[in-house]
């Protein structure tokens, strides 16, 4: 993890740790001139590691975004941001996306009153995300919400009620609220040149 954040910069979905400011300087000195391919590859890796996806999963999302109407890069980011594991992370119900994925896999999370154990479940506007009524599920979420550093900077498309352990998806995310500094066009270019 630390090698990844040292090389690619801050990845809030992967870890709350930040790269040291001196390591950026060393990387720039060591790397010399970066090729266009390397720049595109690093943006793709940043996206992959932040959302915790395999190469195949990311490629699948790129294909879906390519078939949809509109900007492929924007649609790709919307698809990734509307995943259940990412929504839990953005709500502050988990400290990282892998942590959110574990909550979903262990069946602690309900969407609209039904247990969902698929982290890649695509949330829609007006979805209500809650925890199971079990004490253990509520305790896990309560700990995350209490220690969540990004509670006050909740994106516009989400609302949380920390006392009822309930989150609401208001709308599809606007590109201004993406929680990662990324140039999505470079990611799309990377995949368009691979085929």
From Swiss-Prot:
One of its GO terms (biological process) is ribosomal small subunit biogenesis. GO terms for molecular function: rRNA binding; structural constituent of ribosome. The keyword S-adenosyl-L-methionine does not apply. It comes from the Eukaryota. Keywords: Chloroplast, Plastid, Ribonucleoprotein, Ribosomal protein, RNA-binding, rRNA-binding. The keyword Repeat does not apply. Transmembrane segments: none annotated. Its main location: plastid. One of the primary rRNA binding proteins, it binds directly to 16S rRNA where it nucleates assembly of the body of the 30S subunit. With S5 and S12 plays an important role in translational accuracy. HAMAP family: Ribosomal_uS4_B. This is Small ribosomal subunit protein uS4c. It comes from Gladiolus murielae. The lineage of its organism: Eukaryota, Viridiplantae, Streptophyta, Embryophyta, Tracheophyta.
